[in-house]
Regions:
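Membrane-interface "cap" regions at the ends of multi-pass membrane proteins
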Residues: 1-60, 73-74, 78, 476-512
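Helix-loop-helix junctions that connect adjacent transmembrane segments
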Residues: 17, 24, 59-66, 137-147, ...
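C-terminal membrane-solvent junction of multi-pass transporters and transport-like membrane proteins
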Residues: 29, 344-351, 395-444, 453-458
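Extracellular loop-to-transmembrane helix junctions
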Residues: 44-148, 260-263, 458-470
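Membrane-helix boundary/coupling elements in multi-pass transport proteins
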Residues: 89, 112-127, 233-246, 268, ...
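Helix-loop-helix connectors at the membrane interface of multi-pass transporters/channels
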Residues: 95-99, 125-150, 179, 184-185, ...
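TM-loop-TM module centered on a large, flexible mid-protein loop between adjacent transmembrane helices
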Residues: 95-97, 102, 134-139, 212, ...
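Membrane-interface loop-to-helix entry segments
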Residues: 147-202, 257-261, 388-395, 405, ...
């Protein structure tokens, strides 16, 4: 039996026992790259901006929606930074909520993190499959569900293999994919703005400050927009989930989360403003599923318009890979603490990655993707809306956990109060408000793409699966591993011991 002693004041001992993930494998820049890539900027913009415009009362104010959506998520990013400074655990939200609030709640919230990763992988695989065929002019295959599923599964399997090979290969892949994606988005935006002001498109509009003013919308329109905005920003926390493999693990990953949110708001505003200025709101509203697929990309980039297709493809590909990373590490942390079977904490002796957890993250993603695709593509779209509910839950509770964990520190200075209590709590409350409104909104049958089941829409069922499934998991594990649930609540300054039994680990090469 090995014992890891960890002081929750920002320092960490040197644990012995089973293999650990590779230390200092990722730089601060790699943390930012992984965090930004996980949000799939090109795909998120292509599939979201048009829907902003479609919301009654939003129109030209899409940039204002992006700004307002940024605020609560920036607040939560500061909570990630504060918690990572004292507990750089790859389980992030699971670890922090279980220690600050309760082990039962930590396991429930940790389950929603894993479920959100699995749910979104299906959508990203569908995009990768469809765009992969479009890139080569195979439009019939791109619209054929079976063909798209087969190619999407190949993408998931290939990206799971890259994650399996090691974190450094994963980071290198991300740098290439994100570099190409961001370069194309910037070039597209600059050219679009130049053409908008040159008058080459009669529908072009000049940018005005009113576009950025949220007070020119109704509160209902603003809430509807923020429901989408949460999905737009989700994913930057992946850069924190690889903290144990990062340089300066206490500080770098947390700072990267905050920086990632600013990178995202910058590129989102640039592309949204440029697209709206060049094409106008009528075009964006007419092409909500993919604003780049119509005449926008051809009008801006001419014969090079196919590069935007590649950009969206690389975006979905990068996001699929970076979604496998946090799911596996969340399971690793849970297994290490005994919240789920300890075999999920296996570390591959050569690749130094979560062995069983990585494979199961890929397997469950494939199973979910195939199952949802068989039901309906509309269900797949509604699952993305439900994903926003899961994100609100686990981001929100991360904010609450931060305030509770630092409860005896928050009144020691104004800075502490603002960064450790006010911002995390406001961020959490805002996301709980969005969650409540979203449950009401998607509870109305008119707001679902697919038919309701037992009176509820698919997004609501995703939320029920998240909370209900988590409760069932907690009940089962209370009987199977009661020692985890006896762990006391922690606060800043406490020292804990995490006990790991080597005899509970099977060899990493015998995972299946």
């Amino acid at each position: 039996m090995s014992t890891e002693t960890e002081s929750l004041t920002g320092s960490k001992g040197s644990p012995t026992g089973p293999p650990q993930m590779k230390k200092n494998a990722l730089s601060y820049a790699s943390n930012i790259v992984i965090g930004v890539a996980s949000t799939a900027p090109a795909y998120s913009l292509a599939a979201t901006v048009g829907f902003f415009v479609l919301i009654v009362g939003v129109g030209v104010h899409s940039p204002a929606i992006i700004i307002v959506s940024f605020i609560p998520l920036f607040f939560i990013a500061t909570a990630y930074k504060a918690m990572n400074e004292v507990d750089p655990d790859c389980g992030t939200t699971f670890s922090w909520v279980s220690r600050a609030m309760s082990p039962s709640l930590g396991l429930l919230i940790g389950w929603t993190v894993i479920l959100s990763d699995i749910v979104v992988n299906a959508n990203q695989a569908q995009i990768a499959g469809s765009y992969g065929f479009q890139l080569f002019g195979l439009d019939n295959a791109a619209s054929n569900t079976l063909d798209v599923v087969i190619l999407g599964v190949i993408f998931i399997v290939g990206l799971t293999w890259i994650c399996w090979r090691g974190i450094e290969l994963s980071a290198l892949t991300q740098q290439f994919l994100l570099g190409f994606e961001m370069t194309l988005l910037v070039i597209f935006s600059v050219v679009a703005l130049i053409k908008a002001y040159s008058g080459s498109n009669p529908a072009s509009m000049h940018v005005t400050l009113s576009w950025f003013n949220p007070f020119q919308m109704s509160f209902t329109a603003l809430l509807d927009g923020v429901l989408l905005g949460v999905f737009l920003y989700w994913g930057w926390d992946t850069g924190v989930s690889v903290n144990e493999e990062s340089e300066n693990s206490n500080d770098g990953p947390g700072k990267s989360a905050v920086v990632s949110t600013f990178v995202l708001i910058g590129i989102y505003l640039l592309v949204t403003v440029a697209s709206q200025a060049y094409a106008g709101t009528k075009y964006l509203a007419a092409n909500p599923d993919d604003i780049f697929a119509g005449g926008l990309s051809k009008g801006v980039l001419g014969p090079l318009h196919f590069l935007l297709t590649i950009s969206v493809l690389t975006s979905a590909t990068a996001a699929t890979q970076t979604t496998i990373l946090p799911a596996a590490r969340q399971a690793l942390s849970m297994g290490r603490r005994g919240a789920i079977p300890r075999r999920f904490a296996e570390i591959h002796p050569t690749n130094l990655i979560p062995a069983r957890a990585t494979i199961w993250a890929g397997v469950l993603s494939v199973i979910w993707f195939i199952a949802i695709s068989i039901i309906s593509s509309d269900v797949l779209a509604d699952c993305v809306a439900g994903l926003g509910f899961l994100v609100c839950i686990y981001y929100g509770f991360t904010g609450f956990a931060c305030t509770i964990f630092y409860r005896y520190e928050i009144f020691k200075s104004v800075k502490n109060f603002v960064t450790l209590a006010l911002m995390p709590t406001l961020g959490g409350l805002a996301l709980m408000g969005v969650l409540g409104y979203g449950l009401y909104f998607y509870g109305q049958s008119d707001n679902d793409s697919s038919a309701p089941f037992l009176g509820l829409g698919v997004p609501d069922w995703i939320a029920i699966l998240g909370v209900g499934g988590g409760i069932i998991l907690v009940i089962i594990r209370r009987f199977q591993a009661p020692e985890f649930f006896r762990e006391p609540r922690q606060k800043y300054g406490d020292t804990i011991e995490t006990v790991t039994r080597e005899d509970e680990f099977a060899p990493a090469d015998s995972m299946l």
